[in-house]
Design a protein with these regions (language model features):
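Exposed beta-sheet edge and beta->alpha loop/turn motif
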Residues: 88-143
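Short, surface-exposed loop and linker segments with low hydrophobicity and enrichment for Pro/Ser/Thr
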Residues: 4-6, 69-73, 130
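N-terminal secretory signal peptides
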Residues: 1-9, 15-21
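Short, solvent-exposed secondary-structure boundary motifs
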Residues: 13, 68-72, 109-112
Length: 143
């Protein structure tokens, strides 16, 4: 059955109402990754881990890696969102993640890592949390 003018107007109105919600969701996702990058750059592993779901698979490994990484190194992190798909409860995000790692030792080397990191997000109590990161090895301290 063809849509009538009132149906089209109603659909357009509903779409207009929903548009800011999706725009807000995208901004919230960007804010989350800005927070994660800042936490690493400031050497604050606990602030990074606060935005991660503690029940995610391999959380303990990620926690060990992040805490060791920030304790042993000075970091500069930059994250670009390449792909962001999903709804207001879950998102699948691909990130171009750059991590510069300089050892705190006097003769410390500079290591640059750049990788596509796949991330799944879940909204928990009105906040986005990281539900999975792949590869977790990206966050391992240099050997």
């Amino acid at each position: 059955m063809p849509a009538t003018a009132p149906d089209i107007a109603r659909r357009a109105f509903l779409a207009a109402l929903a548009a800011p919600l999706f725009a807000g969701t995208e901004q919230d996702v960007l804010d989350l990754f800005t927070t994660l990058a800042s936490a690493l750059s400031e050497g604050n592993g606990l602030a990074f881990l606060d935005r991660v779901n503690h029940s995610m698979t391999d959380y303990e490994k990620l926690e060990r890696n992040i805490l060791a990484l920030v304790a042993q190194n000075e970091l500069v992190a930059a994250i670009d969102v390449i792909e962001d798909e999903g709804d207001e409860q879950t998102r699948a995000v691909q990130l171009d993640w750059l991590l510069q790692i300089r050892s705190r030792e006097e003769t410390g080397n500079l290591v640059r890592r750049r990788e596509i990191v796949k991330c799944r997000l879940e909204r928990m109590k009105k906040k986005w949390k990281v539900a999975s990161l792949d590869p977790i090895s990206f966050f391992a301290p240099p050997t």
